Regions:
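Short, well-structured N-terminal submotif of metal-dependent ribonuclease cores
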Residues: 1-49, 63-73
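Acidic, PIN/NYN-like endoribonuclease modules and their adjacent C-terminal/linker elements
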Residues: 1-8, 115-149
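Active-site neighborhoods of divalent-metal-dependent phosphate/nucleic-acid chemistry enzymes
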Residues: 3-4, 83-126
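Acidic active-site catalytic centers that drive phospho-/nucleotidyl reactions
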Residues: 12, 111, 129
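Alpha-helix capping/helix-boundary segments
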Residues: 15-16, 50, 93-94, 114, ...
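Structured helix-beta-strand junction loops
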Residues: 40-41, 84, 121, 139
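Phosphate- and divalent-cation-binding pockets in alpha/beta enzyme and binding domains
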Residues: 53, 97, 134-135
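Active-site-proximal, substrate-binding regions of enzyme catalytic domains
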Residues: 55-85
């Protein structure tokens, strides 16, 4: 019996960061997504700008009065991230469909790109960005990472 198509799941940078920084909330839920991806139950998809957002968040964890990571740890985390076989969609393909989502939801443009991708694929969007999540509620298909099962 042939396996059916793999269900796409859109993840944003707030989820991807949790794969790499162990002191984050809901890392168990984020790692469950990775396990399901590894078992070919889901396909992880994101707009291509995720490739810039995640390293930026990792670098930010090295800065400030109480850095969470050393520079070497940040480099290792970024290398780990770059080795993940995420399927990315060129952000430029999503710009026009994201624009009305910014105005209707009052969210940041880069967040609207994730939402536009999820809607174009008919896929859920999983986020751990509380401000974004609260701003766009109720939004069908948007799942808070802590609620992901």
């Amino acid at each position: 019996m042939a396996a059916g198509p793999i269900n796409p799941v859109v993840v944003d940078a707030s989820v991807a960061v949790k794969w790499l920084l162990p002191d984050e909330d809901h890392t168990d839920r984020a790692r469950l997504l990775l396990r399901r991806y590894g078992q070919a139950e889901i396909q992880l998809v994101a707009p291509s700008h995720l490739r810039f957002e995640v390293p930026s968040a990792i670098v930010a964890a090295t800065l400030g009065r109480a850095p969470r990571l050393s520079r070497d740890e940040a480099r290792d985390a970024i290398e780990d991230f770059l080795s993940l076989p995420l399927h990315t969609v060129d952000t430029s393909e999503l710009i026009l469909s994201a624009l009305p989502l910014v105005y209707s939801n009052g969210c940041a443009f880069y967040d609207a790109l994730y939402l536009a991708l999820a809607r174009s694929l008919g896929a859920p969007l999983i986020t751990a960005d509380r401000r974004f999540y609260q701003r766009i509620q109720p939004a069908p298909g948007v799942v808070w990472l802590g609620d992901y099962r």
